[in-house]
Amino acid sequence: MSPLLRRLLLVALLQLARTQAPVSQFDGPSHQKKVVPWIDVYARATCQPREVVVPLSMELMGNVVKQLVPSCVTVQRCGGCCPDDGLECVPTGQHQVRMQILMIQYPSSQLGEMSLEEHSQCECRPKKKESAVKPDRVAIPHHRPQPRSVPGWDSTPGASSPADIIHPTPAPGSSARLAPSAVNALTPGPAAAAADAAASSIAKGGA
């Protein structure tokens, strides 16, 4: 190949490389990145079945094996935004899909099947409010211990206990005075006086 032809080919390749080189967003003020239209953004974000990755360890619910291949799968589950914070995206239609999973339990391995739930229809519905009100505490009445041997104790509900009986405090100066019943109880009667006289005469005669 002649040197002139080689130069022409090199110039052509350089021009082709320049035209195919990616243009940076900072190369010119007129360059604009592609903007996703609002209608597409809204459509992608709405509540609908979408492909999500689910770890198989969560689906086994306690059935443990050494290793699962793959360790996670993709299924259609409900997800997306709702127009109100009080709503949530929930499934209204679901079905079961069976998948083959390689279960490795050394030194052997085998193909098994797992049944996974997929969502086919979704809808925004009101969130289930958890009961934030605590149950009322049961009022336990306070019972005073009942004495085992108290004369006249009534075990029926509502009866006054000995601790409930209020003993009035005597007024000042009343402690020296005795009630008439108390004075009568301390003064000897006629029969007691005659008995004392007889006992006195017997004692004198014996002396």
Swiss-Prot record:
SMART domains on file: PDGF
Chain spans, region Disordered: 129-178
Pfam family, any one: PDGF
Tissue: Abundantly expressed in heart, brain, kidney and skeletal muscle.
Major site of localization recorded for this protein: secreted
Disulfide bonds: 47-89, 78-122, 82-124
Protein's cellular compartments: Secreted
Position of the signal peptide: 1-21
InterPro entries hit by this protein: Cystine-knot_cytokine (IPR029034), PD_growth_factor_CS (IPR023581), PDGF/VEGF_dom (IPR000072), PDGF/VEGF_growth_factor (IPR050507)
UniProt biased composition (Basic and acidic residues): 129-139
Gene Ontology annotations of biological process type: angiogenesis; cardiac muscle contraction; cell differentiation; coronary vasculature development; heart development; positive regulation of cell division; protein O-linked glycosylation
Keywords: Angiogenesis, Developmental protein, Differentiation, Disulfide bond, Glycoprotein, Growth factor, Heparin-binding, Mitogen, Secreted, Signal
GO molecular function, one term: heparin binding
One GO cellular component term: extracellular region
Homology family: Belongs to the PDGF/VEGF growth factor family.
Function: Growth factor for endothelial cells. VEGF-B167 binds heparin and neuropilin-1 whereas the binding to neuropilin-1 of VEGF-B186 is regulated by proteolysis. VEGF-B seems to be required for normal heart function in adult but is not required for proper development of the cardiovascular system either during development or for angiogenesis in adults.
PANTHER family noted in UniProt: VASCULAR ENDOTHELIAL GROWTH FACTOR (PTHR12025), VASCULAR ENDOTHELIAL GROWTH FACTOR B (PTHR12025:SF12)
Subunit organization: Homodimer; disulfide-linked. Can also form heterodimer with VEGF.
Protein known as: Vascular endothelial growth factor B
Lineage: Eukaryota, Metazoa, Chordata, Craniata, Vertebrata
Gene coding for it: Vegfb
